[in-house]
């Protein structure tokens, strides 16, 4: 698309930020933590919106304010939790590509109605890899949060783009965000040990649960909002340690249930009552301590259909992005006549480059 350029992002205010990707998809086969972005959908969408592979490295922010300065014009996208996004004080939109001019500061503040924000950058973000992924592994001590003044390097092949109208997004591509409301509808399928819980299974399906303060990337601890009893096993046989999937809803002794997330070990010895679907896991990746959760039983077929719809939407957005980038390549081609080049919309037109007609 253009001559490669090297960009440097200086981290001015790191908060809790790190390099992240979608994780080690084959890690469980060799006993390795899968890791990766807890909100896989938002991370994949951030990369898709800037025409990067969905599994490419990006920056993940957790809860705290973040700021960085670039020395090169960049195309970026900010997805995930609701936040205030500004470039040199000018408000910017989430879930759309943003032009980040050289010498300006990007600030992402007041992260709310969700926990994690993802910053995708068009180009190749340099990152150390372990078993094919840059995802941090806290057990092995791989990966670390950014420090103030640290520099993140990006190789960019996108041509320099001029966008004089900061009040409008350069593209409007119709990416659908999560519904952030502090109350999460989480679909689950039956776990391998559900029969051992008898009628107490209804204590999971029919009540609201609250996310506990000790929840993290390894798993979420939840208790009932009314402090009522949780499901319990009706049998007394010993449970041997065995492989458990990401999303396993375990029931240890006590008054909390445990949902294993992407930082979990590959084996565990608690009974597995249910398994959160892939779509539900991305939602749980945004659940804050104090948020409430309602579990909704679904069939395996429904869980697969939900995931396919989400993947189809990512594919549709990717197609729109490729169309927009093809137009940009034509616009910047020295062999194309200026009279036949695509024209940018004027500031009075509420549609922008790349916006499908059905979205306006």
Label the model's feature ranges.
Residues 1-360:
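Conserved "landmark" site that anchors the functional core of diverse proteins
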């Amino acid at each position: 698309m253009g001559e490669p350029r090297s960009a440097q992002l200086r981290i001015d205010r790191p908060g809790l930020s790190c390099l992240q990707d979608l994780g080690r998809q084959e890690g469980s086969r060799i006993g390795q933590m899968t890791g990766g972005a807890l909100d896989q959908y938002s991370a994949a969408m951030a990369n898709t919106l800037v025409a990067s592979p969905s599994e490419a490295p990006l920056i993940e922010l957790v809860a705290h304010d973040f700021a960085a300065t670039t020395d090169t014009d960049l195309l970026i996208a900010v997805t995930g939790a609701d936040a205030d996004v500004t470039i040199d004080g000018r408000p910017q939109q989430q879930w759309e590509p943003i032009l980040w001019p050289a010498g300006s500061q990007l600030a992402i503040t007041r992260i709310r109605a969700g926990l994690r924000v993802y910053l995708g950058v068009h180009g190749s973000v340099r990152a150390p890899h372990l078993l094919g992924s840059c995802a941090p592994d806290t057990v092995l001590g791989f990966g670390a949060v950014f420090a103030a003044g640290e520099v993140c390097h990006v190789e960019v092949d996108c041509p320099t783009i001029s966008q004089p109208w900061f009040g409008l997004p350069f593209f409007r591509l119709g990416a659908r965000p999560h519904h952030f409301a502090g109350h999460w509808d989480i679909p689950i399928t039956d776990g391998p040990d559900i029969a051992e819980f008898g009628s107490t299974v209804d204590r999971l399906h029919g009540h609201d649960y609250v996310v506990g303060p000790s929840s993290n990337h390894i798993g979420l601890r939840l208790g009932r909002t009314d402090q009522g009893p949780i499901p319990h096993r009706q049998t007394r046989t010993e449970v041997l340690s065995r492989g458990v999937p990401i999303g396993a809803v375990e029931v240890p002794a006590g008054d909390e249930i445990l949902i294993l997330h992407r930082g979990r070990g590959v084996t565990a010895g608690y009974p597995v009552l249910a398994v959160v679907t892939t779509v539900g896991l991305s939602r749980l990746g945004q659940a804050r301590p104090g948020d409430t959760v309602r579990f909704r039983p679904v069939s395996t077929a429904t869980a697969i259909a939900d995931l396919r719809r989400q993947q189809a939407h990512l594919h549709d957005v990717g197609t729109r992005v490729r169309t927009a980038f093809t137009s940009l390549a034509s616009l910047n081609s020295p062999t194309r006549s200026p009279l036949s080049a695509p024209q940018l919309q004027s500031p009075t037109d509420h549609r922008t480059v790349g916006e499908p007609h059905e979205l306006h």
